[in-house]
Amino acid sequence: IFLCLTSLFIFNFCFGCEFINLSYFIGCDLLSYSLILLSFWICSLMIMASEQIHVSGYYSHLFLICVLFLLLSLFLVFSSMNLFFFYLFFEISLIPLLFLIVGWGAQPERIQAGFYLMFYTLFASLPMMIFLFYLYLSVNSMDFMFLLVDFDSVFLFLCMSLVFFVKAPMFLVHLWLPKAHVEAPISGSMVLAGVMLKLGGYGMMRFFVLFSSVVSKFGWFFVGVSLLGGVLVAFICLRQSDMKALIAYSSVSHMSMVLAGLLSFSYIGFCGAFVMMIAHGLCSSGLFCLANISYERVGSRSLFLNKGMLNLVPSMSLWWFLFCSSNMAAPPSLNLLGEILLITSLVSWSVFNVGLLGLLSFLGAAYSLYLYAFTQHGKYFSGLYSFYSGFVREYLLLFMHWFPLNLLVFKGDFF
C-alpha cells in the first residue's frame, strides 16, 4: 500500500531537469526516483517469491538481511549526486547479489557463475576508476551539477563506458548474464533482471553528457554492434531448452535496443530507453517468477519436461500468455510504448536501422510465442506423480508485476 501511494507521488509531482536535494550527496530527479521505486517494488516481490526459503528455514534471516542490504545499496546508487559515491555503491551492490547466488543457488555451478559475475564487472570497472581520478584532476569536482565539460577522447570514453556495457549487458560482454541467471535463486534472478541491468542504462544516461562529441562521431559503431548482437541473441533464444536461459537471453536482446537508443543521442531515444528499462524490469521479473513456479512443481527448468501446463494449471497459463505477450511488446503493455519510442529514434537517426529493428521485433515475438507454446501446449510430462495448483500468493505476485506494467502506459506523458 505504501509503495502504491509513493507511486502516486510521480503522477502528481512535476519533476524538472533539476535534482531535488535530500542532502549534499543525495538527491532525486524523475529518472532516479522511478528506478528507486522500481527497486523497492522488485525487492518487496523478491521476498514474496522466496516462500521456499522461509518454509525450509534455510538461513531465512540472513536472506532478509541480504535483500535489505542490496536494496539500500541500490537506493544509494540511484540517489547519489557525487560520482565517487555512485561508483562506490555501484560496486557494493555486487556483494549482496553474489551472496544470493552463491548462498541460495541450487546447483554446484553457482560458484562458477559467481566468478563470472565478479570478474566481468570488476575487470570492467577498474578503467572507470582511472577515468574518475582524471575527471577530478580536470574539473576539481565530482558533483553531477558541475560536470559541464566535453571530453573528446575515445580512450576515456571506453574507460568510462566499458563497465556500463558489461552491466547492461552489451553483446560480446554478455556471457556472465545467462550463467548468473540460470544458477541464481528466484530472488537473485528477479533483482538481476529487474534492477541490476538498469544500472548500466542509468550510468550511461548520466555520463554520456560528458562525451557528446565522441558519441556523435563513433556512436554508429556501438549502435551497429548492439542491434546486430540483439538479433544474434534473439536467434540464440530460439535454440534454448532451458526456460531461465531463454528469458535471460531475451533480456540481452531487449537491452541491446535500449543501448542503441541511448547511443542515438536523441531525446526520444533517452525517453524510449527509460520506458523500456522500467517495462523490461517488470516483465522479465514476472517471467522469472513464472519459470520458478513451474520449476517448483516439475522439479526441472527444461522446456521438454515443462509441457502441457494448460492441462494441469489452466489459470496459470493466462499469466504465461499475459507476460509472453508483454515480452513481445503487444499492446497495452509499457514495452510497446518503449519500443515505439526507440524505433522512432533509431530510424530517424539512420534509415539503415530499419532492417535490424524489424528483425529484432519479429524475433522478439517469435521467441515469446515459442516459450508460451512449448510450456502450455503438448502432452504433459508422464513422470509427474503429484501436482498442486497455484497459490493465492503466486497469483498476487504475478498481478503485482503485471498491473504496473500495463497501468504505466497511460502515464506516458510525463516526458
Model features per residue range: what roles?
Residues 1-415:
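Core, highly hydrophobic multi-pass alpha-helical transmembrane subunits of bioenergetic inner membranes
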